[in-house]
Each structure stands twice: as structure tokens, then as C-alpha cells.
């Protein structure tokens, strides 16, 4: 052993006996190291247990993202209970006194838990990245079951990578080369192997996580800017809210028999008993043209749809007609009404070339500059045959139903053209989603930063020792390795600092107020249930 001044040996029956097993350190060093590491270990255990209990008792924390944090807390708890205390004992005693089997079990548990922390951070980074960049496709698949599968894979990969090699390497090579009073991984005795494991276990994951976080940050900032532009676009004045409706002429030839002379006479005789058209207005057709069928909307059903590029190449026999409808009892000639009362829609009109030769449809001026996003409306029309030059309608024709168009849904619908109330609701929802995304990104950034700060010193020393074996002091090795453990202490603090729900739940649990809160909630709901 080094340093005879640290020893305190006496003799019994001529045999030297060492009463001071901590001969590498002075007494004050032992007390300081033991006290500091014990406090850090206690904070690590309490913090990660709080994370687990909070996830259990608070349903607001049972989100997919927090499942990954729960897995990370499990790995950190293992490190806080076993790794920190055993490694501190090894440092203070200067030798391993628990035997080779306990050494291998500790190393396997230590490396599996540490690698699981890295894998969980990698999974969290990918989860955040896909949630931000592919919100429609990925979030539909983002379920607790899938999160459990990813967590299981992270632990399984970590176990396969380290546990068999640590426990079985001495049997593969035929002997154990690690001295009895030391505890280290046998196959990491070569600096080149140590260098390779550091690259695979730290530098590659950190590089991937950093790239993903940079992209997450850019996408979040882009969405923040887009949301600000969207909020500005929906802040219109009262004068802009009330716009005159664009009347659309709807004329299409259906399979309806040409009116006879008797029917025309009846139509002219029924001018005074007309029905108000609530949705479609038109003009009389020419006498030389074919019979024109005028439609009155009875029922409608709206559905959101968005056309693809293929829909822009429709033939003329399958026209897209723009229709403006109004609610009952609000129509008057020349009356202006707000966007809440009127909607511009697109309806596919089916025509038959054998029935007519006149143009199939007319579009209002607004239709020429219609944006890509559209709303389909399924109308139930009543065909009314009009005599030439008449203004009134006849209710004696057949009913024809125009089926809704089936356009493929686009990725992100626009709020342009919607009513102000609906636009405001959509903007508010987007803002809430963006706030949640930013909070999750902040939590990820804090965890990632803590991971890089605590793990980088040790892995730099690993690279240095590959080229210079004696350049890194033993004390610095111990400090760097212990600093990796401190990451497990910092993680719960990051959750509390970045997530208000975690912070409030931690506070209630530490102050023993959670049970009181549950009782108050129970009494509140019982009181409300008794109200008439």
C-alpha cells in the first residue's frame, strides 16, 4: 500500500495487524468523502422515488413523454442505491473486499443502468423530434403501449451489450486476470477497447442527441413565428368581419324531363305562391336553350377535405361548383352578412352531355382565386323546373342527392376563410400545443445539458489515457467516474425546474399534503353529487 504515514499498525504475538483499512486517505478526507457521497446518494434516492410516486398519484403526469422519464428515474435510482455507495466504499478502502462475484454483479448492474440512462435519453430525443416534425403521423402512433415497448428495448439492448460480457468474459478466455483486491471489467484492460466503448456508449449518442435537439429547437422557433403570424392574421377589424356574400350561379343539367306546355302554364300561374330560396340564386335560361334545372338546398352536411394535385386536372364533364348558402330566415336582396353566417363551399356537379349543350356551371368571382384548402358540402337538392322568363318555382319535381366530393386530406389545414370564432379556437389550440411542446423541449434540453456536463470529463480522460497511460491521476479518475453518477442526482431536479406539475407534486409529497388534497377532492365531489 502507498503512504506508510496513513497506516496505524500494531503487533499481536509478533504478527503485524493493521487497524486502519483506509490507509490511502487521512481521517478528515474519509469523513468528508463519506459525508458528501452519502448526502448525494440520499438526494438521488429521494428525488427519483419522488418522480415514481408523483407519476403514480398524479394522473396529469401520466403522459407518454413522462413514461420515458419514469424509466430514466428507475435507472437513476439503481445508481443511487448501489453504484454510488459501493464505489465510494471501494475508493475509501483502496481495495475491493467483497469478492469477485459481487464485483462482477456490481459492474454489470452499474454499466447496464448507466447505459440504460443513455438509451432512454436517446429515445426521449427521438420522441421529441418526431413529435415536432411529424405531428400528424407520429402522434397517432405515440401510445403508452408503444412507449413501453421502446423502454423495454432500451433496457434489453443495454443488458445484452454489457451483462453477458462482464459476467462471462473470464469463462470465455479461460481465466480471470483481474487481481482479487481490484474490481474492474476484464475486457476493458486494453486501452483501445476502452476507447471504442467510450465512442459507442457516449460520443455517438451525444452527437445524435445534439443534432436532434438543434432540429427540435429550429422547428419550435419556426412554429412560434408561424403562430405569431397566424394570430396577426385573425385579428381583423369589425368592418372586415362583415363582408358581402358572393352569389354563385348554379346551373347544371340533370336527368329531369323537359316541362310540358301545361306545366309551363301552371308555373306562370303560381308566381304569387313562391318559396324563398335559402342557398342558390339564378337567372332564367334562354328560350332557345335546353331546360334548365334550378335547385333549392334542403339539407347540407359539411366535412373538411383538401384536394391533391390530381384534383386539379378534372375534366370539364365533372365540374366543381362554388355555392354560397345562408341560414333560414336571414336572406334579403342586397343584404350583407358576416362570415359566421355564410360559408363558401365547393360541390361537384354531375352532368350529362346528352341532356344539354349549354355550359354546365358558372362560378362567382371568388371562385377564381380559391385557395387549395376547401370544404366539401353534401347537399340534398330539390329540382325545380322553371319556365322561360319566370321567377317562381314549382315543387313538383324529383329529388336528386349530390354526393360529397372525396378529396384526400392535406397535412395542415389553414384557418383562412373560416369564421373568426373558429379561427380563434384553432389558434388557441395551436398555441396550447406549442406551449406543451416548448415545455417538453426545455425539459429535454436541461436533461441533455446535465448529461453532457457530468459525463464529458470522464470520457475525455478515457481518450487521454489511450495515448498516455500515466497522464491522468488516480484521484482525477475517481472524481470523473463519480461525476457520471451525479447525473442521476441532477435529473429529478431538472424535472422539477422545467415542469410545474412535477414541482407542485414534489412539494405536496414532501410536505405530506397529497393525502389531504385527495380527501378535499373527494369531499368536493361528494358535495357536488348531493346538490339537486
From Swiss-Prot:
The modification Phosphothreonine is found at residues 501, 505. It is a multi-pass membrane protein. Residues 280-294 have a biased composition (Polar residues). Residues 54-66, 127-146, 215-443, 499-532 are cytoplasmic. This is Muscarinic acetylcholine receptor M5. Keywords: Cell membrane, Disulfide bond, G-protein coupled receptor, Glycoprotein, Membrane, Phosphoprotein, Postsynaptic cell membrane, Receptor, Synapse, Transducer, Transmembrane, Transmembrane helix. The chain crosses the membrane at residues 30-53, 67-87, 105-126, 147-169, 192-214, 444-464, 479-498. It comes from the Eukaryota. Residues 263-294 are annotated as: Disordered. Residues 1-29, 88-104, 170-191, 465-478 are extracellular. GO terms for molecular function: G protein-coupled acetylcholine receptor activity. GO terms for cellular component: dendrite; plasma membrane; postsynaptic membrane; synapse. Gene3D superfamilies: Rhodopsin 7-helix transmembrane proteins (1.20.1070.10). The gene is CHRM5. Glycans are attached at residue 8. Residues 270-279 have a biased composition (Low complexity). Disulfide bonds join 103-183.
Amino acid at each position: 500500500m502507498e503512504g506508510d504515514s496513513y497506516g496505524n499498525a500494531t503487533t499481536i504475538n509478533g504478527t503485524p495487524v493493521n487497524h486502519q483499512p483506509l490507509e490511502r486517505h487521512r481521517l478528515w478526507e474519509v469523513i468528508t468523502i463519506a459525508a458528501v457521497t452519502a448526502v448525494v446518494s440520499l438526494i438521488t434516492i429521494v428525488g427519483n422515488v419522488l418522480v415514481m410516486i408523483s407519476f403514480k398519484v398524479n394522473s396529469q403526469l401520466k403522459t407518454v413523454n413522462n413514461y420515458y422519464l419514469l424509466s430514466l428515474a428507475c435507472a437513476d435510482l439503481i445508481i443511487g442505491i448501489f453504484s454510488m455507495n459501493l464505489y465510494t466504499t471501494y475508493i475509501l478502502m483502496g481495495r475491493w473486499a467483497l469478492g469477485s462475484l459481487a464485483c462482477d454483479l456490481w459492474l454489470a448492474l452499474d454499466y447496464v443502468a448507466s447505459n440504460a440512462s443513455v438509451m432512454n435519453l436517446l429515445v426521449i430525443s427521438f420522441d421529441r423530434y418526431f413529435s415536432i416534425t411529424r405531428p400528424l403521423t407520429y402522434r397517432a402512433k405515440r401510445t403508452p403501449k408503444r412507449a413501453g415497448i421502446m423502454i423495454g428495448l432500451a433496457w434489453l439492448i443495454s443488458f445484452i451489450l454489457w451483462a453477458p460480457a462482464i459476467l462471462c468474459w473470464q469463462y470465455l478466455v479461460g481465466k480471470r486476470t483481474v487481481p482479487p483486491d481490484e474490481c474492474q471489467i476484464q475486457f476493458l484492460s486494453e486501452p483501445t477497447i476502452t476507447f471504442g466503448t467510450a465512442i459507442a456508449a457516449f460520443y455517438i449518442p451525444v452527437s445524435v442527441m445534439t443534432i436532434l435537439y438543434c432540429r427540435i429547437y429550429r422547428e419550435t422557433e419556426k412554429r412560434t413565428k408561424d403562430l405569431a403570424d397566424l394570430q396577426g392574421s385573425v385579428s381583423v377589424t369589425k368592418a372586415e368581419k362583415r363582408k358581402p356574400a358572393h352569389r354563385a350561379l348554379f346551373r347544371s343539367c340533370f336527368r329531369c324531363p323537359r316541362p310540358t306546355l301545361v306545366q309551363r302554364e301552371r308555373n306562370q300561374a303560381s308566381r304569387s305562391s313562391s318559396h324563398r330560396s335559402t342557398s342558390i340564386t339564378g337567372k332564367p335560361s334562354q328560350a332557345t336553350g335546353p331546360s334548365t334545372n334550378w335547385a333549392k338546398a334542403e339539407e347540407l352536411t359539411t366535412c373538411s377535405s383538401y384536394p391533391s394535385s390530381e384534383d386539379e386536372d378534372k375534366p370539364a364533364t365533372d365540374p366543381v361548383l362554388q355555392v354560397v348558402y345562408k341560414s333560414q330566415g336571414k336572406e334579403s336582396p342586397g343584404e350583407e352578412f358576416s362570415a359566421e353566417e355564410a360559408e363558401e363551399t365547393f360541390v361537384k356537379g354531375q352532368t350529362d352531355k346528352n341532356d344539354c349543350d349549354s355550359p354546365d356551371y358558372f362560378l362567382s368571382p371568388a371562385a377564381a382565386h380559391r385557395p387549395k384548402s376547401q370544404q366539401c358540402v353534401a347537399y340534398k337538392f330539390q329540382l325545380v323546373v322553371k319556365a322561360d322568363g319566370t321567377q317562381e318555382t314549382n315543387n313538383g319535381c324529383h329529388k336528386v342527392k349530390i354526393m360529397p366530393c372525396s378529396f384526400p386530406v392535406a397535412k395542415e389545414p389553414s384557418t383562412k376563410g373560416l369564421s373568426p370564432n373558429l379561427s380563434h379556437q384553432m389558434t388557441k389550440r395551436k398555441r396550447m400545443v406549442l406551449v406543451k411542446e416548448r415545455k417538453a423541449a426545455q425539459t429535454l434540453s436541461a436533461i441533455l445539458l446535465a448529461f453532457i456536463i457530468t459525463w464529458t470529463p470522464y470520457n475525455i480522460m478515457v481518450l487521454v489515457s489511450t495515448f498516455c497511460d500515466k497522464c491522468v491521476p488516480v484521484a482525477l479518475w475517481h472524481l470523473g467516474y463519480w461525476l457520471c453518477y451525479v447525473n442521476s442526482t441532477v435529473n429529478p431536479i431538472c424535472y422539477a425546474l422545467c415542469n410545474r406539475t412535477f414541482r407542485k407534486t414534489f412539494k405536496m409529497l414532501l410536505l405530506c399534503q397529497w393525502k389531504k388534497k385527495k380527501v378535499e377532492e373527494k369531499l368536493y365531489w361528494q358535495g357536488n353529487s348531493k346538490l339537486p
